[in-house]
Swiss-Prot record:
It is found in: Cytoplasm. It is an enzyme of class 6 (ligase). SUPFAM superfamilies: Anticodon-binding domain of a subclass of class I aminoacyl-tRNA synthetases (SSF47323), Arginyl-tRNA synthetase (ArgRS), N-terminal 'additional' domain (SSF55190), Nucleotidylyl transferase (SSF52374). It comes from Synechococcus sp. (strain CC9902). Disulfide bonds: none annotated. Belongs to the class-I aminoacyl-tRNA synthetase family. This is Arginine--tRNA ligase. The gene is argS. The keyword Cytoplasm applies. PANTHER family: ARGININE--TRNA LIGASE, CYTOPLASMIC, ARGINYL-TRNA SYNTHETASE. Monomer. Its EC number is 6.1.1.19. GO terms for molecular function: arginine-tRNA ligase activity; ATP binding.
């Protein structure tokens, strides 16, 4: 009901201006969706903050506003008579015929009432970002699917979105790994197919142990880093092969999860690192402290009360993550050809990096690298925990590999499906079982994560996420399947030109819920909280199921049939669209 609320907001502002033409206070109707159905569709709470400046009781102010609204023909065509409640709230109910018109305008459309944003702007979403020579684990799950969902919503709103994978493809670890492989398995550096990622991870662990225990190996590794940074062809070839092998393994997981990303690793920004120092020097932010080049933060102090530094060049002349992140921010906001010209840059990482990004963002802001009106945002998320409330681990105490987690989700989904088929005495092909199990299993993993407020930790449970009841992917997928079954039973779900007619309260409840979709999408775009969309889709499914269980559809009277089928069609379209924005495909049968 976004367009209706915007119209209503303008009408309320005009009424307030007419009621209080001499008011010096800001006249804001404070229009919001009604908190309960009995309060109507919207509530205007703007009378309360005017009580003090106008020196009038809020109910008296509300009455004056309502008196002005009563003479507004356009308002009367949109709303029923407003009601004043409590200390001065104005409850507003949209006329049923306007709700039906609004729904009719959305039927069969691709956008389902969601407007394209007026100010289209380039957006960068930085997410996933695994490290080369390491396998993706459960910790990468949240960044990958939260970032993908946010990118999908921003794209749906009309923004040009650059989905960046800031992979860890540079640093001391490569000197360490290349040195180790040259010494113990030189054949692995001949071709990218000579070693798989699992072996590479094992080699990395061996190299790390040698680096920590052996001073000579450590020195040789540092020399290898210098060669790599200097462009030594042998070192660069070895580095490229390691990156290619990891990249192929990452892509298998991205394909499986239907994730699109443009890789732009840390190494991309190497040529831009000296300019970071030059830029900070130019605005007198750079300070030498104990041989290192730093920027001291404003308003952030350590235990000793002194300002904390962001180190951008170590005392040995090397750069670090902060330098790379500053170079990335500068590039992403800069104009082409040496930048992305973004107006909004979003980083999706775990909450443990909040202080790091707060510091880096402050430095970039003070350096003048963030254009006026542009947005630079960190989207933090909590940990994935086991059912014991501790960080999710394997029984052996290792980090859970993402590949293994997805495999188990699909396996459990298939077990549940085969059990259900046996109970229902249904026979399905192996291809059907495989397709449904894969779709439901992966959807369950995604939805279980996205349905949680990303700011909190959440407990991972296969049993809960695969349940057919509750706020789960299977429950939502089944709602779509249920509607698809109407067509199989002879219901025409095609778009009809017949006027929509509703009489039952369950119908109107569903109409109102369907019309909330546009507002929810705009909220997710602004607040970057995918769980808002999940909550809406779950509520929509519940409202639809109550409608379908309590009101006849296929056996409806002729005058009601087409309108009820239209409700079913639009519910399915909304669920499919909403789930697609979460990266979840739907099914026709389960």
């Amino acid at each position: 009901m976004l367009s209706l609320s915007q119209t209503l907001d303008a009408q309320l502002r005009a009424a307030m201006q007419r009621a209080f033409p001499d008011a010096e206070a800001t006249l804001d109707p404070q229009l919001a969706a009604a908190s309960k159905p009995e309060f109507g569709d919207f509530q205007a709470n703007g009378a309360l903050p005017l009580a003090k400046p106008l020196k009038q009781p809020p109910r008296q102010i509300a009455t004056a506003i309502v008196d002005q609204l009563s003479g507004d023909e356009a308002f009367n065509a949109l709303c029923l008579a407003p009601q004043i409640a409590g200390p001065g709230f104005i409850n507003l109910t949209i006329r049923p015929e306007r709700l039906a018109e609004e729904l009719a305008a959305r039927l069969g459309t691709d956008r389902l009432g969601v407007p394209v944003v007026e100010d289209v702007a380039p957006v960068v979403v930085d997410f996933s970002s695994p490290n080369i020579a390491k396998e993706m684990h459960v910790g990468h799950l949240r960044s990958t699917i939260i970032g993908d969902s946010l990118a999908r919503v921003l794209e749906f709103r009309g923004h040009s979105v650059l989905r960046l994978n800031h992979v860890g493809d540079w640093g001391t670890q490569f000197g360490m790994l290349i040195t180790h492989l040259k010494q113990v398995a030189p054949e692995t550096l001949d071709t990218a197919d000579a070693v798989d990622l699992g072996d590479l991870v094992a080699f990395y662990r061996e190299a790390k142990k040698r680096f920590d225990d052996d001073d000579d190996f450590q020195a040789t590794s540092r020399d290898e880093v210098v060669k790599l940074q200097g462009g030594d062809p042998v070192s660069l070839k070895a580095w490229g092969l390691l990156c290619d092998q990891s990249r192929r393994e990452f892509q298998k997981l991205y394909d499986r999860l239907d994730i699109r990303l443009t890789e732009r690793g840390e190494s991309f920004y190497n040529p831009y690192l000296p300019a970071v120092l030059d830029g900070l020097k130019a605005v007198d932010l750079l300070v030498t402290d104990d041989g290192a080049q730093c920027v001291f933060l404003e308003g952030v102090t350590g235990k000793d009360g002194n300002p904390l530094p962001v180190i951008v060049q170590k005392r040995d002349g090397g750069f670090n993550y902060a330098t790379t992140d500053l170079a990335a921010i500068r590039f992403r906001f800069a104009s082409p050809p040496t930048g992305d010209a973004a107006q909004r840059v979003i980083y999706v990482t775990d909450a443990g990096q909040a202080n790091h990004f707060a510091g880096v963002f402050q430095v970039a802001e003070r350096a003048g690298w963030i254009p006026d009106g542009a947005r630079l945002e960190h989207v933090p998320f909590g940990l994935v925990q086991g059912e014991d409330g501790k960080k999710l681990k394997t029984r052996a105490g290792d980090t859970v590999r993402l590949r293994d987690l997805l495999d188990e989700a699909v396996e459990r989904s298939e077990q549940d499906l085969r059990s259900r088929l046996q109970e229902e005495e249904r026979t399905e092909s192996d291809a059907f079982i495989s397709h449904v199990a894969t779709t439901v299993g992966l959807a369950a993993v995604k939805y279980a994560d996205l349905s949680q407020n990303r700011l909190t930790n959440y407990q991972f449970s296969f049993d809960r996420m695969l349940a057919l009841q509750g706020n789960t992917a299977p429950y939502l997928l089944y709602a779509v399947v249920r509607i698809a079954g109407i067509a199989r039973k002879g219901g025409d779900l095609g778009v009809s030109n017949a006027a929509l007619q509703f009489s039952e309260p369950q119908e109107w409840a569903l109409v109102r819920e369907l019309l909330k979709f546009d507002r929810v999408i705009v909220e997710v775009e602004d607040e970057l909280l995918p769980n808002r969309l999940c909550s809406y889709l779950f509520e929509l499914s519940q409202v639809f199921n109550r409608f379908y269980d309590q009101v006849p559809v296929l056996k409806a009277e002729p005058e009601a049939l087409s309108s009820r089928l239209a409700l079913c069609r639009h519910t399915a379209d909304t669920l499919r669209c909403g789930l697609a924005l979460l990266g979840i495909p739907t099914l026709e049968r389960m």
